[in-house]
From Swiss-Prot:
GO cellular component terms listed in the entry, alphabetical order: ribonucleoprotein complex; ribosome
Organism: Caldanaerobacter subterraneus subsp. tengcongensis (strain DSM 15242 / JCM 11007 / NBRC 100824 / MB4)
Phylogenetic classification of the source organism: Bacteria, Bacillati, Bacillota, Clostridia, Thermoanaerobacterales
UniProt entry keywords in alphabetical sequence: Metal-binding, Ribonucleoprotein, Ribosomal protein, RNA-binding, rRNA-binding, Zinc
Entry-linked PANTHER family: 50S RIBOSOMAL PROTEIN L31, CHLOROPLASTIC, LARGE RIBOSOMAL SUBUNIT PROTEIN BL31C
Family: Belongs to the bacterial ribosomal protein bL31 family. Type A subfamily.
Protein name per its UniProtKB record: Large ribosomal subunit protein bL31
GO MF term (any one): rRNA binding
Annotated residues for binding of Zn(2+): C17, C19, C37, C40
Cofactor or coenzyme needed: Zn(2+)
GO biological process: translation
Role description: Binds the 23S rRNA.
A Pfam family it matches: Ribosomal_L31
Subunit-level organization: Part of the 50S ribosomal subunit.
Xref: Gene3D superfamilies: Ribosomal protein L31
Amino acid sequence: MKPGIHPTYYHDAVVKCACGNTFITGSTKKEIRVEICSKCHPFFTGQQKIVDTGGRVERFRKRFNLEEK
């Protein structure tokens, strides 16, 4: 590695989430702020929301006069 061209690497960088969770990781920034983390993300918490796309399908069928089989 060439000296003087690489950013400083911090082994104790703090990641702060909007939910209040903090953890330590390695990064070129000393502090990182995120909006969502593994403690509050729906995939990890098991509280997934199901997106209702049924209305769009029904509108498509109605537009093209298709019947459900």
